[in-house]
Amino acid sequence: ADTLLREVEFSVGVLERAGLRRREASTVFVGGGTPTLLPPGDLARMLIGVRDAFGLAPGAEVTVEANPDTVTPAVAQELAAAGVTRMSIGMQSAVPHVLAALERTHDPANIATAVAAARGAGLAVSLDLIYGAPGESLADWQSSLEMALAHEPDHLSAYALIIEDGTKLARQIRRGEVPAPDDDLQADMYELADTTLAASGYEWYEVSNWSRGEAQRSRHNLAYWRGQDWWGYGPGAHSHMAGLRWWNVKHPAAYAQRLALGESPAAGRERLDDDVRGIERLLLESRIREGVGIDVVTSEKRSAVAGLIADGLIDGGEAIRGRVVLTLRGRLLADAVVRALTP
């Protein structure tokens, strides 16, 4: 916590030296793993440090990710007192063998305890799910969705499992010990999630995110998808301000050493030109419910729009109104849509 607060102080100095006005934070998101493994007092101190440095806008959304095993009423109350308004609980699955495949150690029974603790502290609740783990069936996924809905969260995220190079799971797949994720099964799981959640009153607002209404959407994540500015703190954190993107060194020791010496923890940076910013707008904004303006598609790629409508990937009516908006089929093939529309 002390090192992260040192970076917060460093960022204030950077803005002052650049003659830039400090803006109140409209959203804060504490994630990147399992922050609730930290003592709640340290988490609270970090949030208070950010608030003191920048201020929080009225009605600011302040989210903390949480492992279900670490959330007690006392923890939730302490976080709420520090200004947290929302808790994103890493449920992942309700099925023990799926959790084992994902190498998650929490007890599914603790989801109810964590949700009750968060609600008791007045926090909004989001549940995070992952689908497509080795050995997970469509029936397993249905069980996880039903269990998640039984907790009546304000918001729900469902992400397809991505196999990261260098992980234990990647090595097991390479050796043939476990099967690779099945694309067709993952598509069936996504469609099941969308149908099940819609029937329970949840509306999709981003490819992998659903909420009970507009007020329950994650404003912080929407800021990412809309290409707005953010400042990320911590080892490996990425930031984006006024067309400049930079990222911190990943190793915690190197990160701490740089800040102790009064140096920037940034490992690299790049200025995004108009072409790159246009591509990124298409990549990110096409994922959200309102879509992206068709003006971001270059003139030589506009001809692809008709084909995407014919293939049922984007909404024809929205295209006439000047928007690229994904259909359900388009959400399943979002990357292909972006490839078709980028130079």
Segments predicted by a language model, with ranges:
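C-terminal scaffold of the Radical SAM
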Residues: 1-296
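An alpha-helix initiation/capping motif
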Residues: 187, 298-299, 328-331
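Auxiliary N-terminal substrate/complex-recognition segments of SAM-dependent methyltransferases
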Residues: 282, 302-303, 335
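Short amphipathic alpha-helical interaction segments
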Residues: 298-312
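A short, conserved structural fragment
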Residues: 309-321
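Minor-groove-contacting beta-hairpin "wing" of winged helix-turn-helix DNA-binding domains
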Residues: 321-327
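Short, amphipathic alpha-helical interaction segments positioned at domain boundaries
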Residues: 328-343
